[in-house]
C-alpha cells in the first residue's frame, strides 16, 4: 500500500459529520462527478475513482446524507485497469437532480466553484480539503527523497479556490500552484507543511507516521552530514600533516634543522618522528611544557614560512 493509499484509507473510515458532509460532497462531485442525462432509470450522478477508499467515502456520504439509492460497480481489465488499478464507480440512481441542486452544482455550467455556504466555517473548510485530497490528491512517502503533496483539478477557478483555502488565515500552508500536463495542481513541498495538512484533514495516524519517518530521515541526514564533515576534516588534517612532514624533511636534507631556534626545532623533530600525528597530539608529546594545539600551529606556520623562503631563494 502506498502512503497515498494509506492516507485515503484512514480518511475513508472517519465518522460522517452531517454538518459538513455536503462540503465534502461539493468537492467530490466537482472534481470527480459525472452527470448522465436520460438513462433507463432517469438522470444519474456518478463518481469514478481508481481508489477504493475514495469510493467507500463517497458511498457513505451519500447514504448517510441523503439515504440515496446507490449502485456501485468495479471495472476490471481493459482500458480501465491502469497501472494495475481498477476503476470504481458510485452511482446515485434516483436522486441525482436533488443532490445537484442541494450542493448547488449545475452540470451544464462551466462554474465549478464551491458556494460559500459550504465553506463558511473552519470545519467545513477542513471537510472540503479532505474530500479534495480523497478525490484527486497524492502524497509522496515520508521516506522518499523529496517531500511532495498535491491536489489536481482541470478547472482553474476550482484550483484557485483550493489554493485560497489552504493559504487562508486558518491554515496558512504556503501552497503553490503549477500547470502540469493539461491540469492544474496545488502543491506543498516541505515536510512541516505536509504534516500540517494531514492534521487539518484529520489523517492523524498518517500524520504521526509521516512525522516519525521524517524525524528519522532528518536524523540520518544529520548523522551523514556530520560523518561527511568528520571525514573531510580527517582528510584535511592528513593532507596538512603530509605537507608539514615533507617541509620538515626538506629542512633536514638541507641541514637546516640544527640552525633553527630550539622551540621550532622541537616541533620539526616531532613532526619528522610522527608524520601522521595531529597538532593536538604533537602538543601532548612535548615534555616539560604546556603547549596547546594553537601554540604548535603557530610554530608550524613559522617553519612552513622558512621552507617557503628557502625554496624561493633556491629558485
Swiss-Prot record:
InterPro entries: Homing_endonucl (IPR027434), Sporu_reg_WhiA_N_dom (IPR018478), Sporulation_regulator_WhiA (IPR003802), Sporulation_regulator_WhiA_C (IPR023054), WhiA_LAGLIDADG_dom (IPR039518)
HAMAP family: HTH_type_WhiA
Keyword line: Cell cycle, Cell division, DNA-binding
One Pfam family it belongs to: LAGLIDADG_WhiA
Superkingdom classification of source: Bacteria
Gene name per UniProt: whiA
Gene Ontology terms describing biological process: cell division; regulation of sporulation
Molecular function per GO: DNA binding
PANTHER family per the UniProt record, alphabetical: CELL DIVISION PROTEIN WHIA-RELATED
Known function: Involved in cell division and chromosome segregation.
The entry's DNA-binding region: 278-312
The keyword Cell division appears for this protein: yes
Similarity-based family: Belongs to the WhiA family.
Protein known as: Probable cell division protein WhiA
